[in-house]
């Protein structure tokens, strides 16, 4: 899981370059997931950050990739009731922090600590990971027009979402989690949906309902 989130955040930072243009690969690795995320953030210039807790699931981090790209922010990792020292070091010049998840994921104590540092805080969290991903999409839409969304299964499709996270970040495109059968939104005209995963992950009915292009191996 530490390797997975490190890879995901690396992709979010790097975007999606042409594979033929890659002449070398830089290894970024910390002693744990918190330091790895901080080392990646060191490669960026930013005034905003996105904070997620990946102790139990990667879902919030994957949903946040489009928002991170939209506001030009690194994804940093938090514990529920405290900010790890490696994460705290990366907050020095931050003006705004987006907390992903309810207080069950990242508690009020973390929010208060950020505010004490003079950082504006916006929390985006729903009743579950599906609603949270939809609320993140709404936040992106309030900042910029959306012309594409990725939909995947929020419980069995994390690997599929990970494969699209770099593109979602590059394009500021939401990754919306579903139960594989329904979506928490009405598809708008001019928005292209991409369904991530096979029929076992995303049903054919959902693909038809959203007029989505299925991306599956």
Task: For each feature predicted by the language model, list its residue ranges.
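Extracellular glycan-binding segments that recognize GlcNAc-based cell-wall polysaccharides
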Residues: 2-13, 17-217
